[in-house]
UniProtKB/Swiss-Prot annotation:
Transmembrane segments: 515-535
Protein name (record): Eukaryotic translation initiation factor 2-alpha kinase 3
Subcellular location: Endoplasmic reticulum membrane
GO terms assigned for molecular function: ATP binding; enzyme binding; eukaryotic translation initiation factor 2alpha kinase activity; Hsp90 protein binding; identical protein binding; misfolded protein binding; protein kinase activity; protein phosphatase binding
Function of the protein: Metabolic-stress sensing protein kinase that phosphorylates the alpha subunit of eukaryotic translation initiation factor 2 (EIF2S1/eIF-2-alpha) in response to various stress, such as unfolded protein response (UPR). Key effector of the integrated stress response (ISR) to unfolded proteins: EIF2AK3/PERK specifically recognizes and binds misfolded proteins, leading to its activation and EIF2S1/eIF-2-alpha phosphorylation.
Length: 1116
């Protein structure tokens, strides 16, 4: 009794309870055993269709007319056919005799137009089955997409019409019925003419034999076996009402759409009544709702037969009998087509069986008593339920109460579609369907008897999915229940709300719906799985990997293409450009260089590639905004001067530097010109080599009226790299003018103090943090970046860089190198930054807040190219902005880490080659130490190669003086040593123990890093996990057995270099002179050794002089 209020109530069907006379003494097992009816012959009217055997399982009806081609045929036209065969009434079973009066029958009308009679006293055995030959009760083309687009009209069996809106997912009652259409004007709109009609046909049947006695229609009556008709025989009067509407074009006569609905009505005529003057049955559910109401507990004695209650499942096409005591299933009969109507013939009366009776019979009396009010409310709610079903591809509606009568009907409603001023409110049924089956996926049960009925489902879904927009999207759902609530109808006069109902107490002994194989839907299943996988992958990548292109291999990226920007135009641009020209300021950068492209930006500046107008060679120009504080600016300039003096074959160096102080807002307006084009993708953080766009100025004159800006984006056709050294472009610039290709290093005026704090570094202002990439040692989220990676190099691995530093390799203008590989030059921007702030005491809350922002990594937020971005707190600069321009050498980018990643086996790493590489690294480190400097951040990603395979040590962001006193170090590096570098696992992996623990350290930290680099050169790793684990063990002097056996001499040297005590580590000069390198034989060994000794000697003398006069990084 709780089924009306719980979600599982309607999964099987809404069943009507009628009490029939039955046999109380029979058990459930005996009832099931005897409840299987034998196939019977059936009378065929008109077409003489053969009888279709049915049983307790679903079997398709033979000779059933396809729903898509149903034509309503009145029975009166058949007698005039020549050679017509007399219709043959159904033959009773062998053991069946004519039933005397008083016996009960269950009469069932199905959608295929057949009438069947079941004997409830004989376990539901089919008494007779009759096909009157007039076709299906429902046929329509209104639901096809080509008729009304995304809307479809669904007819009801009683003549009402509903409209399904797929976009709104709602069911609306159409304010006209079939009869109103027929009564309206024949012309419907300008392009539609309505034709059709309503036909009534009456059939006289023998109540207990099912033989057709006569058929009457508008054309007359015809009788069969009138002589044999017994005067005392009971007669069943069946009246079929069929309504048909067709819409045709007035000019062509082509049919546009049609639909036809019909239903049967039944009346019982006892033997004492006359059959003359038959009047239409009084049992119409629309006219007398009292006889169509749900049978309550008071009326159960009328529908009970020996304590057996009859119920009909509309969704499962079943008629079932339950025992009143215990609610056990006594018998059931399965039809092969949907049930349209049902009647109980008992004691000379015809009782309509409501198809939406949801009363549940259970032995739990306590539940019924405790929830009596809820059950009564649910019974009243489901009394007005609507069932949306599908038969042979055609959607239809069934309801125990005509919902359309609750609302006004307008015969000319469709004519208002063309009238914009016409407003007709349409009642709406919210689309919250109640699936009739408790288990949507059927259990596969093998049975030959089910095959015929299963084919009906298959035909229905196949035809419907091809011809209409599917509402029933699941193949194992024959329909949905749409219960209509009176309470909500009173609150909302124009809305019908659908609610989910369930009944957990529904009898579980009822047999599940017949199974349907899933093999037919394998394509849909596979497509759904693939779509889910693709959608999930896409969502995960977008949510957790916002920049997947940055994870590509550097060898797969491109440097630039010739994808051009449109010329900057518009009144706003002209206004800004006029202001720039009228300022009268002339930039040295724009005077001496022709900007080619923007290579990227880092935490402290923007890097451009520019061509010198004098020598036609390409350089890397880096623009840095200097801090406003004098002390911080002084330290920046001192470090730049010191690094510019480093000249060694194994060390990259700077070329030139100058300062520019443009007028206020001048630099911002220049940058704004470049950011006008929305197609320029400037990331919030520093661009990676994979997505950094290249911008090229073709023609822009500060004093011209028009300017032309072109973009050079990444291109797969570009060569491997930028050239080592400064390449000589043999072709002179075709453009005589140049443009201010610059980006404001500080587009937010509120971070000036933050920059001051950030520039109070012991490390170089030109450097940023370069993090070792890898699975376990940092996920490339450092601060250095390397632009324009090699496309063809097999060693390059993906890396995400945000460096503000530039390390350039051999200088000079090598024409030969440029001619051989004119576009193989590569720029490396990857010098390490300290990420350390000066230990200063903020003088105000603002400066303290800004210092906090500067300390927080990553630092790219201190330099933003987004000129439209405003912060909530702005500070006006106390002095004009000053920019430092540094002219640096373009160099090839292929670091040692990429080289090792491309050689993952010992066989691929020859001992002599690895030692040769290491020796060159040691030579460069020895030169640094001889100059009184220490690198402090040696690792494979900071070691580079020239075009002729000469090793270069770069990324001098953490270079500092070896003799720097403790006081200055405190001033310049307030953070712990391990935090001063990057705080990332990648760099920390190569740091010495004293750096990690924050203790004081010396130049021996570079020796510790050299030991790890030598080990990694000789001992390859297959995975990053193995690399991290092994290097961690080696730091603790736990070497792999393979390394100690294969390289005994190198093992001893590495063990000394990795000593926990800095005093026990050898000097760089001792490493170079180690006996391990004596046996090496490679070209240029002698020259390299002599050059190294010469530079070291001169460097030592210079260092001594510097110590007497001033240090490379003098302190205040």
């Amino acid at each position: 009794m709780e089924r009306a209020i719980s979600p599982g109530l309607l999964v099987r069907a809404l069943l009507l309870l009628l009490l029939l006379l039955g046999l109380a003494a029979r058990t459930v097992a005996a009832g099931r055993a005897r409840g299987l009816p034998a196939p019977t012959a059936e009378a065929a009217f008109g077409l003489g269709a053969a009888a279709a055997p049915t049983s307790a399982t679903r079997v398709p009806a033979a000779g059933a007319v396809a729903a898509a081609e149903v034509t309503v045929e009145d029975a009166e036209a058949l007698p005039a056919a020549a050679g017509e065969q007399e219709p043959r009434g159904p033959e009773p079973d062998d053991e069946t005799e004519l039933r005397p009066r008083g016996r009960s029958l269950v009469i069932i009308s199905t959608l295929d137009g057949r009438i069947a009679a079941l004997d409830p006293e004989n376990h539901g055995k089919k008494q007779w089955d009759l096909d009157v030959g007039s076709g299906s009760l429902v046929s329509s083309s209104l639901s096809k997409p080509e008729v009304f687009g995304n809307k479809m009209i669904i007819p009801s069996l009683d003549g009402a019409l509903f409209q399904w809106d797929q976009d709104r997912e709602s069911m609306e009652t159409v304010p006209f019925t079939v009869e109103s259409l027929l009564e309206s004007s024949y012309k419907f709109g300008d392009d539609v003419v309505l034709v059709g009609g309503k036909s009534l046909t009456t059939y006289g049947l023998s109540a207990y034999s099912g033989k057709v006695r006569y058929i009457c229609s508008a054309l007359g009556c015809r009788q069969w076996d009138s002589d044999e008709m017994e005067q005392e025989e009971d007669i069943l009067l069946l009246q079929r009402t069929q309504k048909t509407v067709r819409a045709v074009g007035p000019r062509s006569g082509n049919e546009k759409w049609n639909f036809s609905v019909g239903h049967f009505e039944l009346r019982y005529i006892p033997d004492m009544e006359t059959r003359a003057g038959f009047i239409e049955s009084t049992f119409k559910p629309n006219e007398n709702t009292e006889e169509s109401k749900i049978i309550s507990d008071v009326e159960e004695q009328e529908a009970a037969i020996m304590d057996i209650v009859i119920k009909v499942s509309v969704a499962d096409w079943k008629v079932m009998a339950f025992s009143k005591k215990g609610g056990h299933l006594e018998w059931e009969y399965q039809f092969c087509t949907p049930i349209a109507s049902a009647w109980l013939l008992k004691d000379g009366k015809v009782i309509p069986i409501s198809l939406f009776d949801d009363t549940s019979y259970t032995s739990n009396d306590d539940v019924l008593e405790d929830e009596e009010d809820i059950v009564e409310a649910a019974r009243g709610a489901t009394e007005n339920s609507v069932y949306l079903g599908m038969y042979r591809g055609q959607l239809y509606l069934q309801s125990s109460v005509r919902i359309s009568e609750k609302f006004p009907s307008s015969p000319k409603a469709l004519e208002s579609v063309t009238n914009e001023n016409a407003i007709i409110p349409l009642p709406t049924i919210k689309w919250k369907p109640l699936i009739h089956s408790p288990s949507r996926t059927p259990v596969l049960v093998g049975s030959d008897e089910f095959d015929k009925c299963l084919s009906n489902d298959k035909f229905s879904h196949e035809e419907y999915s091809n011809g209409a927009l599917s509402i029933l999207q699941y193949p194992y759902d024959n329909g949905y229940y749409l219960p209509y609530y009176k309470r909500e109808r009173n609150k909302r006069s124009t809305q019908i709300t659908v609610r989910f109902l369930d009944n957990p107490h529904y009898n579980k002994n009822i047999r599940k719906k017949d199974p349907v194989l899933l093999l037919h839907w394998w394509k849909e299943i596979v497509a759904t799985i693939l779509f889910c996988i693709i959608a999930t992958t896409f969502i995960v990548r977008r949510l957790f990997h916002p920049h997947p292109h940055r994870q590509r291999k550097e060898s797969e990226t491109q440097c630039q293409t010739e994808n051009k920007y449109d010329s900057v135009s518009g009144e706003a641009n002209d206004s800004s450009w006029n202001d720039i020209k009228n300022s009268g300021y002339i930039s040295r950068y724009l005077t001496d260089f022709e900007p080619i492209q923007c290579l990227g930006r880092g935490g402290f500046g923007v890097v451009f590639e520019a061509k010198n107008k004098v020598d036609d060679c390409n350089y890397a120009i880096k623009r840095i905004r200097l801090p406003n504080r004098e002390l911080a600016r002084e330290k920046v300039m001192r470090e730049v001067k010191a690094l510019a003096k480093l000249e060694h074959p194994g060390i990259v160096r700077y070329f030139n530097a100058w300062l520019e102080a443009p007028p206020e807002k001048w630099q911002e307006k220049m940058d704004e010109i470049w950011l006008k084009d929305e197609s320029t993708d400037w990331p919030l953080s520093s661009p990676s080599p994979m997505d950094a766009p290249s911008v090229k100025i073709r023609r822009m004159d500060p004093f011209a009226t028009k300017e032309h800006i072109e973009i050079i984006a990444p291109s797969p056709q570009r060569s491997r790299s930028f050239s080592v050294g400064i390449s000589c472009d043999q072709t002179s610039s075709s453009e005589s003018q140049f443009s201010p290709l610059e980006f404001s290093g500080m587009d937010h005026e509120d971070i000036s103090e933050s920059v001051d704090a950030a520039y109070n570094l012991q490390d170089s202002c030109l450097t940023d943090c370069d993090v070792e990439d890898g699975t376990m040692d940092g996920n490339d989220e450092g601060h250095s970046f390397e632009l324009c990676p090699s496309e063809a190099s097999p060693y390059v691995r993906s890396r995400e860089r945000t460096s503000s530093s530039i390390v350039f390799e051999d200088s000079g203008c090598d024409n030969a190198s440029s001619k051989e590989e004119p576009k193989t030059n590569r720029l490396h921007i990857g010098n390490h930054c300290a990420n350390k702030l000066t230990a200063f005491k903020p003088t105000s809350s603002k400066s303290s807040s800004e210092a906090t922002l500067s300390i927080s990594p990553p630092r790219p937020t201190t330099l933003s190219l987004d000129l439209t971005k405003n912060t909530t707190e702005k500070l006006q600069p106390s002095s004009p902005k000053v920019y430092l321009y540094i002219q640096m050498q373009l160099c090839r980018k292929e670091n040692l880490k990429d080289w090792m990643n491309g050689r993952c086996t010992i066989e691929e790493r020859e001992r002599s080659v690895c030692l040769h590489i290491f020796l060159q690294i040691a030579e460069a480190v020895e030169f640094l130490h001889s100059k009184g400097l220490m690198h402090r951040d040696l690792k494979p990603s900071n070691i580079f190669f020239t075009m002729d395979d000469v090793v270069k040590v770069g990324d001098f962001g953490l270079v500092t003086a070896m003799d720097q006193d403790e006081e200055e170090q405190t001033v310049l590096t307030p953070m712990p040593a391990y935090a001063r570098h990057t705080g990332q696992v990648g760099t920390k992996l190569y740091m010495s123990p004293e750096q990690i623990h924050g203790n004081s350290y010396s130049h021996k930290v570079d020796i510790f890093s050299l030991g790890l680099i030598l080990f990694e050169l000789l001992y390859p790793f297959s995975t990053q996990m193995e690399r991290v684990r092994t290097l961690t063990d080696v730091r603790n002097l736990k070497f792999p057995p393979l390394f100690t056996q294969k390289y005994p001499c190198e093992y001893v040297m590495v063990q000394d270099m990795l000593s926990p005590s800095p005093m026990e580590r050898p000097e760089a000069i001792n490493i170079i002179e180690n006996a391990v390198f004596e046996d090496l034989d490679f070209p240029g060994k002698t020259v390299l050794r002599q050059r190294s000794r010469s530079l070291s000697s001169s460097g030592t003398k210079h260092s001594r002089q510097s110590n007497n006069s001033h240090s490379p990084l003098p302190s205040n």
